[in-house]
Design a protein with these regions (language model features):
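Surface-exposed cleft-lining segments at the edges of enzyme active sites
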Residues: 38-46, 145-152
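Structured loop/turn residues at beta-strand edges in well-structured enzyme cores
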Residues: 25
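Conserved acidic residues
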Residues: 28
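A short, conserved alpha-helix within the catalytic core of class I
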Residues: 39-58, 67
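A conserved beta-strand element that flanks and buttresses the S-adenosyl-L-methionine
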Residues: 31
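Hydrophobic adenine-recognition pocket in adenosine-nucleotide-binding enzymes
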Residues: 35
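Class I (Rossmann-like) S-adenosyl-L-methionine-dependent methyltransferase catalytic domain
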Residues: 1-22, 63-214
């Protein structure tokens, strides 16, 4: 209700869920900007099915669903290490790791070189690339965003899009629909505040254009 009131105040047209449920073959394009990962994070399986069915029904037969969202780690099970940028941020990174484990966003790290109240050396972690992906992209939000962001997964794979949209509703396989990878270099200084890295390890956003096959 708060969001709807803000949209009204800014003269922005919108549809309520009830209106969208009664909409059929209406839109040429439905644009999901940083929405897909939130649907995966917060909705139950029945709620996801209901939401994607509703969007598919509202789209014209020749319409397109555009998904712009986080990317993914292409080799999620590979084991590697990463180093915290300095001892001054050891504890902040460690807090994020503990919270992400608690919320089942990441698995327990295989090896953790963490000493409580150690002010001399930056921590070094050995874990999967998937864990590193989630840890790094979450930590840059800062602890003020911990409660909200630590509940969300940022891994948006083609397989996940296929599972929830393409196969159930007859869209082309998502891996063939990857339209663009964005590397926003303004992210790099924020990542380097917490981690010893020289370049962006992954795209900061990916864009899919999903088209119907029937």
């Amino acid at each position: 209700q708060i969001v709807q009131n803000q949209l009204k105040e800014n003269d922005i047209d919108f549809l309520t869920k009830e209106q969208l449920q009664n909409t059929e073959d209406e839109f040429d394009v439905i644009y999901l900007s940083s929405v897909f990962h939130e649907l995966m994070s917060y909705l139950s399986r029945p709620e996801r099915r209901e939401t994607f069915a509703m969007l598919d029904k509202a789209l014209k037969p020749d319409g397109v669903i555009v998904i712009r969202d986080w990317g993914y780690e292409p080799n999620p099970n590979d084991i590697t290490s990463f180093e915290v940028a300095s001892s001054t941020v050891n504890e902040e990174v460690y807090i994020w790791i503990k919270e992400l484990i608690k919320n089942s966003i990441i698995e327990n790290l295989r090896v953790v070189d963490h000493i409580e109240n150690d002010e001399l050396e930056p921590d070094i972690y050995v874990t999967t690339k998937q864990n590193i992906y989630e840890i790094m992209l979450h930590t840059v939000w800062g602890l003020n965003s911990l409660e909200r962001e630590a509940q969300e997964t940022y891994s948006v794979t083609p397989e996940l899009i296929d599972k929830w949209i393409c196969r159930p509703y007859g869209y082309r396989n998502a891996k063939f629909e990857l339209n663009q990878e964005e590397y926003d270099e303004t992210y790099l200084p924020y990542l380097q505040k917490y981690f010893k890295i020289d370049e962006l390890p992954w795209p900061t956003k990916i864009i899919y254009e999903l088209r119907k096959t029937k």
